[in-house]
A protein has these predicted regions:
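Motif-centric detector for short Cys/His coordination patterns
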Residues: 1-81
Length: 81
């Protein structure tokens, strides 16, 4: 039996923060919520620094230049921290 596997790349479109979590909205409608404590640089950043992010590529990753943090969407989906 053959099984067709279609692999799609998860792409971020927006990042928001609550007091304790990072919320990443994906272009396919999914949302990833992870604790800020997983990323100490982000956990200690100011709201202004958190708001200053750049999507890398087509949204495969997220970069915060003020705190020198890079996170991949694929890594978030795998639970990497």
């Amino acid at each position: 039996m053959n099984i067709l596997v279609i692999e799609t790349c998860a792409l971020a479109k927006n990042v928001q923060f609550s007091d304790d979590d990072m919320i990443v909205s994906l272009v396919d409608g999914r949302t990833i919520t992870v604790p800020l404590l997983w990323f100490p640089r982000l956990a200690s950043a100011s709201q202004k620094q958190l708001a200053n992010y750049e999507l890398l590529g087509d949204g495969e990753g997220i970069h915060w230049p003020d705190v020198d943090e890079d996170i991949s969407v694929a890594g978030l989906l795998r639970g990497n921290h």
